[in-house]
């Protein structure tokens, strides 16, 4: 045989498991002008048979597992198949051309490949009419990369990939494989260590702890075209989000509902409760239940805990058909240290940020991503685009943005390295977030992005062109913390904390805000929403109804974590369902009905959501009554509107048959909502017809009440509104201004 085929260096590298270019030795090799030779590598095999154009022939055996068969010139990969030791008859992987091209390489290493999810990982495809799976992975520091699985006995020498570029992309087409095949990567590092890794670009995984990657065939037939076409029109509409953890919303026979079971039930529930969107705690694959999904190992894969890849597509499709948008929690800020996943992927910190003395984030004991590497940014960008394109999600909420923006987040002096200007901002992360928002908004108009960001970093929701990060909305963590801090105070102490309610209005229009009562506020000893409220049971439920009304009335989009809408008593736990049996108790029924009607009023009232990021949508009426804990304001749909909503919140426990508010001149005032309604479990007060008082009469009433002296010329010369004010309640009036 021609010595070329037994080139000592090639064979030694192949047998030792360090061959980076098996395609140079294996497959169809030209032997002469008239003859080719099929060269095969079957470690451990004594004989190998080849089916060549319908005839079975035995290949010649050489040393070290090398076999070959001389064939006529011009044979094609489709002309022969090889018998494997398990009896499988399949085409030769090394006879097919490599498809990773120069454009792929340029875009990926530049960090701008917008369809990388169709190129990396395990992609079912046909090459020259032969079906199979194309495997591609980025591992620049590996000596050898193999795909292992049931199809090759998990033997790392059988299917080594070919290194198609000096920048570390490896590829192999394995004919005959279909959806459902399990696989992992086996790598030999520069030091010779053998690593077994799951696929960072894997689209599905087996359950922990095995965590094998699974080939999927994305063939779901969607039925939501009408929703997608109309989606862009909904971006300026009402947004009332129900935050859901899939595994603990509702159980059946001791197990969480799967994606399909959940779909119809949750869609109908959201419609009944007038939620416009659901936001899912991460359904990306993750090894630890207790992480709630926030320690992700499968950035392109729905978790298998609740069903298949197609089942989640069905869930989202069903939500859309019921008119409910789907927002995904997504974690590009850090990833877990589990050795089977991305950490030390090719024997080096490939995805990890390493410039700090300790690579681990002090808050979560996880690795942060290195946004200076274009390939890492492309991995993350591709993940977001995958969920929008292949799973039809309508929004992406980026978790822990603050930890991405600041190099010193959670770290003390000496534990972090400043940027090149000596500052603490992570300039690479800022560029990535700008790229993320720019690409999504250009490619998918109508898809929304949300930032969970807890600092005063400027311009979170300002466009990238104007120097901002480009998010659509920022979670207003300050409003949430101040509001809950106030509500947790017992009633005698609230007058000293009125600024918790008024201060957020100073910055309420500095960004486009979303007002969350999220899962983070009902765990780890923080107590449930109802558990935060002071007083006896009646007062606690009255305060919860007041809180829900306060959130609905405030400027900004809305988010409520599941269970808050009916007064879940226990803290949330991912290991059990919500306490739905509480809905058999009248107090909880009342809160549930109150929440439902508040939501309905919200989505039907443009004053509560139209232009709610503009100062013109809000006007104070009065916040001076600190002693009684009363604040009132007007909400407008546009600056010139005569129609408005008057929102009055009484945070105290007193009852006022006649309470006088200073007000602009009114033509009419009608009560729309009273959270003290007996139907909600309230006292039934506050339903007296409001009286509009002229300035003269209003002044007389103030004098009679001792609010001003009779000869006081500095007193307010304004109209008044005499209302019945119930204890611990939100009142919402429809008013027409003169």
From Swiss-Prot:
CDD domains: AmyAc_Glg_BE, E_set_GBE_prok_N. It comes from the Bacteria. GO terms for cellular component: cytosol. It is an enzyme of class 2 (transferase). Keywords: Carbohydrate metabolism, Glycogen biosynthesis, Glycogen metabolism, Glycosyltransferase, Transferase. The keyword Cytoplasm does not apply. The active site is at residues 399, 452. Belongs to the glycosyl hydrolase 13 family. GlgB subfamily. Catalyzes the formation of the alpha-1,6-glucosidic linkages in glycogen by scission of a 1,4-alpha-linked oligosaccharide from growing alpha-1,4-glucan chains and the subsequent attachment of the oligosaccharide to the alpha-1,6 position. Monomer. This is 1,4-alpha-glucan branching enzyme GlgB. The lineage of its organism: Bacteria, Pseudomonadati, Chlamydiota, Chlamydiia, Chlamydiales. The gene is glgB.
């Amino acid at each position: 045989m021609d010595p070329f085929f037994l080139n000592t260096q090639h064979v030694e590298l192949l047998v030792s498991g360090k061959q980076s270019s098996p395609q140079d030795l294996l497959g169809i090799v030209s032997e002469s002008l008239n003859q080719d030779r099929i060269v095969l590598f079957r470690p451990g095999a004594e004989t190998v048979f080849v089916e060549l154009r319908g005839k079975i022939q035995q290949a010649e055996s050489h040393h070290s597992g090398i076999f070959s068969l001389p064939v006529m010139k011009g044979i094609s990969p489709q002309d022969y198949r090889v018998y494997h030791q398990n009896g499988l008859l399949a085409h030769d992987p090394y006879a097919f051309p490599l498809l990773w091209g120069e454009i792929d390489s340029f875009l990926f290493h530049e960090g701008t490949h917008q369809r990388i999810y169709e190129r990396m990982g395990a992609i079912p495809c046909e090459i020259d009419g032969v079906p199979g799976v194309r495997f591609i992975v980025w591992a620049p520091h590996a000596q050898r990369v193999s795909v292992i699985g049931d199809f090759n006995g998990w033997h790392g020498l059988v299917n080594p990939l070919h290194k198609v570029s000096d920048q570390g992309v490896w590829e192999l087409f394995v004919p005959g494989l279909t959806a459902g095949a399990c696989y992992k990567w086996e790598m030999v590092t520069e030091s010779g260590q053998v690593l077994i890794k799951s696929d960072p670009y894997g689209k599905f995984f087996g359950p922990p702890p095995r965590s094998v990657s699974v080939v999927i065939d994305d063939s779901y037939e969607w039925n939501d075209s009408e929703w997608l076409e109309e989606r862009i029109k909904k971006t300026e509409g009402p947004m009332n989000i129900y935050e859901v953890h899939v595994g603990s919303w509702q159980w059946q026979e001791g197990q969480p509902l799967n994606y399909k079971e959940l779909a119809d039930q949750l869609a109908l529930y959201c419609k009944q409760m007038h939620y416009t969107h659901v936001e899912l705690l991460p359904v990306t694959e993750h090894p630890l239940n207790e992480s709630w999904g926030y320690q992700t190992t499968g950035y392109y894969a729905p978790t298998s805990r609740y069903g298949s890849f197609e089942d989640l597509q069905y869930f989202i499709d069903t939500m859309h058909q019921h008119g409910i948008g789907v927002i995904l929690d997504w974690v590009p800020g850090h990833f877990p240290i589990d050795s089977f996943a991305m950490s030390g992927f090719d024997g080096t910190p490939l995805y990890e940020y390493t410039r700090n003395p300790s690579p681990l984030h002090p808050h979560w004991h996880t690795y942060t991503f290195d946004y200076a590497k274009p390939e890492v940014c492309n991995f993350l960008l591709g993940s977001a685009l995958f969920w929008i394109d292949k799973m039809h999600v309508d929004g992406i909420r980026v978790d822990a943005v603050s930890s991405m923006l600041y190099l010193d987040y959670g770290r003390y002096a000496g534990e972090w390295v400043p940027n090149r200007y000596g500052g603490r901002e992570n300039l690479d992360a800022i560029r990535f977030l700008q790229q993320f928002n720019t690409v999504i908004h250009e490619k998918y108009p109508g898809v929304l992005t949300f930032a969970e960001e807890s600092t005063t970093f400027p311009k979170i929701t300002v466009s990238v062109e104007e120097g901002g990060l480009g998010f659509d909305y920022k979670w207003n963590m300050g409003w949430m913390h101040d509001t809950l801090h106030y509500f947790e105070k017992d009633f005698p102490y609230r007058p000293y904390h009125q600024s918790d309610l008024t201060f957020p209005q100073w910055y309420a229009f500095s960004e486009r805000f979303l007002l969350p009562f999220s899962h983070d506020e009902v765990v780890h000893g923080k107590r449930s929403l109802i558990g935060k409220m002071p007083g006896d049971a009646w007062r606690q439920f009255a305060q919860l109804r007041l809180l829900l009304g306060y959130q609905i009335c405030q400027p900004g989009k809305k988010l409520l974590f599941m269970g808050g809408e009916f007064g879940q008593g226990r803290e949330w736990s991912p290991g059990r369902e919500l306490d739905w049996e509480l809905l058999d108790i009248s107090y909880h029924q009342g809160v549930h009905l109150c929440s439902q009607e508040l939501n309905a009023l919200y989505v039907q009232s443009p004053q509560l959501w139209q232009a709610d990021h503009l100062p013109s949508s809000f006007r104070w009426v009065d916040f001076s009554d600190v002693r009684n804990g009363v604040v009132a304001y007007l909400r407008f749909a546009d600056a010139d509107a005569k129609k408005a909503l008057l929102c009055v919140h009484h945070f105290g426990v007193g009852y006022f048959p006649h309470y006088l508010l200073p007000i602009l001149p009114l033509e009419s005032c009608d009560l729309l909502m009273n959270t003290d309604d007996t139907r909600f479990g309230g006292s039934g007060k506050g339903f007296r017809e409001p009286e509009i008082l002229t300035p003269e009469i209003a002044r007389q009433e103030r004098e009679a009440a001792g609010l001003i002296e009779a000869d006081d010329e500095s007193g307010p010369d304004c109209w008044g509104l005499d209302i019945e004010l119930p204890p611990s309640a939100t009142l919402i009036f429809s008013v027409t201004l003169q």
